[in-house]
Amino acid sequence: AHLRYLNNFETLGEIPIMGFNPYKDTPMANHPPSPLEEQLKIMAVTRIMYPEIRITVPTPTIGPKNVEYSLNAGANNLATVIADNYPLEVKGVGSPVCGNYDDVVSVINKLGLTPQTI
């Protein structure tokens, strides 16, 4: 029902899909993270319902090792890909503690895809 609601927006260009990850020292610190399988189902259904839309998945949240599953499920935009030498005083999506660029690019290349560079 929530995905159908998005039909109300004529200029919708992107649907970000990000599962819940608990952060320590927050009210939901002990709540379990969103299961990967549920996130992948949402990506696949979103791709079927919106074949032309950009589906964005933040790599620190999904984890570099799960990028392949996300792309196969229908995601076509990977957000928050961080260079290995980036100064990691970063807070936010996934609160990464190390860069993930090489891991993410390796998965993209393994799938026979070419990463877009900025």
Feature roles, as predicted:
Residues 7-118:
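Auxiliary Fe-S-binding modules of radical SAM enzymes
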